[in-house]
Design a protein with these regions (language model features):
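Cytosolic catalytic headpiece
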Residues: 1-174
Length: 174
């Protein structure tokens, strides 16, 4: 038998598997510390690796304990939770879409720019609007580029498996 293709998982194989918050943008009116606390409390309950990056980023900044209820994983999209009677979302574009949250042009442009840089964008929304965009980066391993080049030299096609959107995946692959 001759191997002619290989599939590599992005996180932890091609990248270091240690995502960190690289950028954050709060929409006007959402810079309030209360929103940071809400985001932190929701992400603290999530099991997704990107959530841990957000938790680490805000753990020193959280000043208020927030009571979160009705926490739900939305498979492949993110999480939803309630604080008081308000529903909050943390996740990807698909979660915004199914929740009927509109992503305005400025936030869309910023998200596309970050994704083009190879970052994964996490959206935080509440009250029917986007409150923040969080860019999470996972550094590509030093050895990955050479390993992929060596496989290509041997005539082996390399495919990357990722939960990221196509733009982020393309930036990492390039």
């Amino acid at each position: 038998y001759r191997v002619n293709a290989i599939v590599l998982d992005k996180t932890g194989t091609i990248t270091e598997g240690k995502p960190v918050v690289a950028d954050i943008h709060w929409t006007p009116g959402a810079e309030d510390e209360r929103y940071q606390s809400i985001l932190w409390e929701i992400e603290r309950r999530s099991e997704h690796p990107l959530a841990d990056a957000v938790v680490q980023k805000f753990k020193e900044k959280v000043v208020n304990e927030i009571s979160v209820s009705d926490f739900e994983n939305q498979t492949g999209k993110g999480v939803t939770a309630k604080v008081g009677d308000k529903v909050y979302l943390v996740g990807n574009r698909a979660l915004l879409e199914v929740s009927h949250v509109i992503l305005d042009d400025d936030n869309e442009k910023l998200a596309v720019r970050w994704e083009g840089d190879g970052k994964t964008v996490v959206f935080f929304a509440g009250g029917g609007r986007v409150l923040a965009l969080v860019a999470v980066a996972d550094k590509i391993k030093e050895s990955s580029r050479q390993a992929v080049a060596t496989l290509h030299e041997k005539g082996i096609d390399v495919y990357m498996l990722t939960g990221d959107n196509a733009l982020t995946a393309r930036a990492v692959a390039d």
